[in-house]
């Protein structure tokens, strides 16, 4: 705990701990945006070929990564028009990133809705042997979306996830948009989006079914 105080500050740690204890009833999410094409100056430590996966290649992920996806997840991602960007090293898939231009599933039965010109990345994975080599598909994929007239990436982080918030702040490319508050009481879930979040068309909501929810 003392290390956390030194790293994040007393107030931040206390806020984070309170929210962590209350997460079954109330969650606070910080929403941020990044201008596409504006990213970290860190260079990849390995050369990769980055391209959009075809629908057949997306279905092929089921065999490459057993247990990561369901057939429904992949089929409905394709149906929605989601884009999966892959990084290939010497012809082998090293990492991938799923991005939505409309709606996307998240954990705990929540879904995300975005509107053009914003895109939302919701599922990524890097093979263990390529981790630490700075294959940052969230950045190198920007050109694919700029070509489609999307100008910003939007993301959200739980307010008690101090490590992720600090990492995002350190990189310096993200602008705070606002917050989403999710309250669950007596089996009912209520959402409050601050004005900045509403302005960009970002929305968290609860889907009527959970068959696409991301694996934990």
Residue ranges of each PLM-predicted region?
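Conserved GNAT acetyl-CoA-binding A-motif
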Residues: 147-158
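Conserved catalytic-core motifs of GNAT/GCN5-like acyltransferases
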Residues: 27, 174-189
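Conserved acetyl-CoA-binding loop-helix of GNAT-fold acetyltransferases
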Residues: 123-146, 166, 170
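Charge-rich, low-complexity intrinsically disordered segments
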Residues: 179, 187-188, 194-216
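A conserved beta-strand-loop-helix scaffold within acyl/acetyltransferase catalytic domains
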Residues: 63-128
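Short beta-strand micro-motifs in enzyme catalytic cores
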Residues: 25-32, 83-85, 117, 181
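Acyl-donor-binding surface of acyltransferase catalytic domains
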Residues: 1-53, 64, 71-73
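Conserved active-site alpha-helix within GNAT-family acetyltransferase domains
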Residues: 159-179
């Amino acid at each position: 705990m003392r290390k956390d105080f030194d790293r994040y500050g007393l107030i931040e740690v206390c806020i984070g701990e309170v929210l962590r204890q209350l997460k079954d009833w109330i969650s606070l999410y910080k929403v941020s945006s990044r201008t596409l094409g504006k990213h970290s100056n860190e260079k990849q430590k390995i050369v990769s070929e980055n391209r959009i996966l075809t629908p057949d290649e997306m279905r092929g992920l089921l065999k490459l990564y057993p247990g990561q996806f369901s057939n429904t997840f992949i089929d409905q991602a394709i149906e929605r028009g989601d884009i999966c960007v892959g990084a290939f090293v010497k012809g082998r898939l090293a990492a991938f990133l799923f991005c939505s231009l409309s709606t996307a599933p998240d954990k705990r039965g929540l879904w995300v809705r975005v509107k053009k010109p914003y895109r939302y990345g919701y599922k990524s994975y890097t093979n263990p042997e390529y981790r630490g080599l700075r294959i940052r598909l969230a950045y190198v994929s920007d050109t694919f979306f700029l070509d489609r007239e999307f100008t910003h990436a939007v993301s959200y982080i739980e307010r008690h996830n101090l490590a992720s918030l600090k990492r995002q702040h350190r990189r310096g490319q993200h602008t705070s948009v606002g917050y989403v508050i999710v309250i669950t009481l007596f089996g009912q879930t209520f959402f409050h989006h601050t004005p900045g979040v509403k302005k960009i068309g970002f929305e968290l909501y609860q889907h009527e079914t959970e068959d696409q929810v991301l694996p934990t």
